[in-house]
From Swiss-Prot:
Keyword Oxidoreductase: no
UniProt-listed GO biological process terms: trans-translation
Pfam families (alphabetical): SmpB
Domain of life of the organism encoding this protein: Bacteria
Protein name: SsrA-binding protein
Family: Belongs to the SmpB family.
Gene3D superfamilies membership: 2.40.280.10
Lineage, uppermost ranks: Bacteria, Pseudomonadati, Pseudomonadota, Gammaproteobacteria, Legionellales
CDD domains found in the cross-reference section: SmpB
UniProt KW Cytoplasm keyword: yes
Length: 159
């Protein structure tokens, strides 16, 4: 009579920001909650979210996600004015905000979102303290990636 309980992964990815990994060296990662309205959660459940050109700013001791695009569902657009590009407050500890703000001010780093995921029943965003790559660094990363692929191809065909 033992029932097997299927465990879902605790963290299900909703959206990735691949461009951030291409444009920045990630130094440290943080997980933050998001303050969302009901229609925004429904849009996220439908997968209508994009993080490509988004970033984090600090205003009056709070962290805000700017540029994340949440497209409203068609039925929401009928009865309310939904702004898909509005800024959304990030939920972080005071200590984490201080650490991020200090690194941005002193070291010239930036804070970018890496992914949006479900943690239990809450939407979380993984943000990273990052340093921008220069053009030659991006080219070097691409060359290294292509070399790894070629190496695996050769080893696979000979092995």
């Amino acid at each position: 009579m033992n029932k097997q309980i299927s465990k879902k992964p605790a963290q299900r990815t909703i959206a990735l920001n691949k461009k951030a990994l291409h444009d920045y060296y990630v130094e440290q990662r943080f997980e933050a909650g998001l303050v969302l309205e009901g229609w925004e959660v429904k849009s996220i459940r439908a997968g209508r979210v994009q993080l490509r050109d988004s970033y984090v700013v600090f205003k009056s001791g709070e962290a805000w996600l700017i540029g994340a695009h949440l497209s409203p569902l068609p039925n929401v657009a009928e009865y309310m004015k939904a702004d898909p590009q509005s800024s959304r407050k990030l939920l972080l500890n005071k200590r984490e905000i201080g650490k991020l703000f200090g690194a941005v001010q002193k070291q010239g780093l930036t804070v970018v979102p890496l992914d949006l995921h479900w943690h239990k029943n809450h939407v979380k965003v993984e943000i990273a303290l990052a340093k921008g790559k220069k053009t030659h660094d991006k080219r070097e990363t691409i060359k290294r990636r292509e070399w790894e692929r070629e190496k695996h191809r050769v080893l696979k065909s000979h092995g």
